[in-house]
């Protein structure tokens, strides 16, 4: 069951976008959008494929009208740039694909392309995304949209090439300097790897804020059936000028320059810019929370998990219920904004919450803040690239809440 915060009713995962005013840093911009939905085409129009999560994301980028990809190879996300190179979208849609000299170069190319109103993206894995944090902070400060894909691996440092979820803090707390956030979507299937590309760009341009797809080595490398989105043409220059009046497009007839920058030397103006940024974040928190619940109708306990850990949690629930333990699942889809009100509501009549992560305990801090001591919260996780087994989670449930 998908639920959105606009209706508080079960729904398909879709948000309709209308003309909405979003505060810029020095002026109010009117962002123009048409209604967008996920997977609304019929089966006859859909193209079903069997592929890896990384491959599905690359195909979705081509089909969603992305203008450019700039990236650097790193396991376990290299299939993204490999697939784009194999598909040669520059010959069909005109999409630019560049293997940059580094992750630092990649994110700054995204900064430049996004500042021109283009739909541009990059992808990397944990240590590579760490190198991108300066550029992401600059994009957030300048109000530049763009997509960053993080297919997580174990750390710290160079770590391992095995899957992990240890980038949670880096993604949800604004990994660079300054008071900022990025929208973070956590897929738990190959289908969502494809679906979240268009959704990420929609939200990123709606609010002029970077968006991140926080995946991991399990989701990136696993193969599943996926319904690819229909082909959508890239926007014309005229459409970009109309939809992105803030963008630096070099258009003729403009007497006042459009400057894309995060720099402001006057503190009183910088404070105003920051206050407007915080107001934008409040709007996002109010309107863009997404999550999924399962087996919660009669649940006495709840597992909170995201990404691949949520897939494992579903099997855990099956095993636990076979033993008479009534447990349900709460899966945050947006890690930022985090569904804290929804978790608090779901926890009202519970005996305990187990937060399952492939890390030492990160999301559990947000869950504890959400329930505010009303119910016991325990954590179970594995480290170093080890993926937890469902039987281990069942054992943790019994030990923590016996």
Question: What is each model feature region?
Answer:
Residues 3-7, 16-19, 26, 30, ...:
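Short hydrophobic alpha-helical segments enriched in small aliphatic residues
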Residues 182-239, 352, 392-402:
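Structural signature of the thiamine diphosphate
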Residues 291-325, 330, 336-342:
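Redox- and metal-dependent alpha/beta enzyme cores, enriched for Fe-S-associated oxidoreductases
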Residues 357-402:
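Peripheral docking tails and interdomain loops at the edges
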Residues 208-293:
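Conformationally flexible catalytic loops at phosphate/diphosphate-handling active centers
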């Amino acid at each position: 069951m998908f639920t959105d915060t606009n209706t508080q009713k079960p729904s398909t995962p879709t948000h309709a976008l209308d003309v909405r005013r979003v505060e810029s840093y020095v002026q109010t911009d009117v962002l123009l959008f048409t209604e967008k939905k996920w997977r609304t085409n019929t089966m006859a129009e859909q193209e079903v494929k069997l592929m890896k999560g990384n491959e599905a994301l690359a195909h979705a980028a081509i089909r969603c009208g992305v203008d450019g990809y700039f990236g650097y190879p790193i396991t376990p996300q290299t299939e993204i740039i490999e697939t784009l190179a194999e598909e040669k979208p520059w010959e069909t849609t005109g999409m630019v694909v560049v293997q940059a000299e580094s992750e630092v170069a990649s994110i700054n190319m995204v900064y430049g392309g996004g500042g021109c109103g283009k739909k541009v993206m990059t992808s990397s894995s944990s240590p590579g995304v760490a190198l991108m944090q300066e550029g992401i902070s600059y994009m957030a400060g300048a109000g530049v949209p763009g997509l960053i894909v993080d297919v997580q691996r174990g750390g710290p440092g160079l770590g391992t090439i095995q899957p992990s979820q240890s980038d949670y803090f880096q993604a949800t707390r604004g990994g660079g300097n300054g008071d900022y956030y990025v929208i973070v979507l956590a897929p738990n299937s190959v289908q969502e790897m494809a679906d979240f590309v268009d959704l990420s760009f929609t939200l990123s341009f709606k609010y002029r804020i970077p968006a991140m797809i926080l995946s991991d080595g399990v989701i990136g490398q696993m193969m599943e059936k996926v319904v690819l989105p229909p082909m959508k043409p890239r926007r014309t220059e005229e459409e970009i000028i109309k939809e992105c009046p803030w963008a630096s497009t070099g258009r003729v007839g403009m007497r006042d320059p459009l400057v894309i920058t995060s720099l402001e030397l006057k503190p009183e103006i910088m404070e105003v810019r920051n206050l407007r940024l915080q107001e934008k974040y409040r709007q996002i928190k109010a309107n863009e929370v997404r999550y999924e619940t399962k087996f919660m109708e009669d649940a006495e306990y709840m597992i909170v998990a995201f990404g691949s850990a949520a897939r494992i949690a579903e099997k855990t629930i099956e095993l636990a219920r076979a033993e008479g333990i009534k447990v349900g699942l709460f899966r945050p889809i947006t890690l930022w904004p985090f569904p804290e009100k929804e978790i608090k509501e779901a926890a009202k009549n519970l005996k305990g919450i187990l937060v399952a992560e492939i890390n030492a305990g990160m999301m559990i801090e947000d869950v504890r803040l959400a329930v505010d001591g009303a119910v016991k919260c325990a954590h179970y996780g594995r480290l170093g690239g080890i993926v937890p087994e469902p039987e281990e989670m069942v054992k943790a449930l019994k030990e923590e809440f016996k």
